[in-house]
Amino acid sequence: VMLALARWLMRGTPYAAGGAALATLVPWLFWLGAAIAALMTLRRGFAPALPVIIAAALPAGWWWAQGDVIPLASILLVTLMAVILRERMRWGETLIVGTLVASVMVQLGIFSPPGGTELMLEQLREGSEEVDRMLTEFANQGYDTQTIAALVVGGVTGLVVLLAAIVCLALARSWQAGLYNPGGFREEFHALRLTPKELAVLVVIG
């Protein structure tokens, strides 16, 4: 079914752009829009795929304005990773770039709650005496609990975005292989090996 969908999408840019836009409009279907954008990028390159990327990003931008940063961040990240994979043909380098960019987004505070963490901390305190006691101890030791909470939320959200981008890229790559190189994705997946240097970089970034 998914391969048939991919075949229909690849009939032309209008099909792919329409599919990406519709998918991203639907809550929790952003991954499909991201995978479509990645498929077009892998197959045709960034410039020819730009209309599809924009079509997926516009509804995701609306979700961003509503407070959900995950769809747009995932689409942008998977597009970048698709460009790297298309040019370098190495999953190791692609994963390193994706992890690095996700880490930078976390550090920039992109994934921090737009309204701050005060309300969230208050709800946590009310819901659990143990959490209330732990947060009080942190505050007594001079730690800013709101900053800690923002870092935790940002880190978890960044991890979700990175995992979503990796899954969407793998899905797009499997579509590409199924349409144009049957069995190629399985061989590529089994051949995936991170060099010690690449593994060390991933550990340091993480």
Question: What is the predicted role of each segment?
Answer:
Residues 1-55:
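Hydrophobic transmembrane alpha-helices
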Residues 17-18, 50-54, 72, 94-97, ...:
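Hydrophobic alpha-helical transmembrane segments
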Residues 20-33, 54-75, 106-110, 206:
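Hydrophobic alpha-helical transmembrane segments in multi-pass membrane proteins
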Residues 60-64, 71-113:
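Short helix-perturbing small/polar motifs within transmembrane alpha-helices
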Residues 93-111, 144-162, 194-195:
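Alpha-helical membrane-spanning segments of integral membrane proteins, especially the hydrophobic core
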Residues 107-152:
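Membrane-interface interhelical loops and short interface/amphipathic helices
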Residues 156-180:
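Transmembrane alpha-helical segments in integral membrane proteins
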Residues 181-206:
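Small-residue-rich helix-loop
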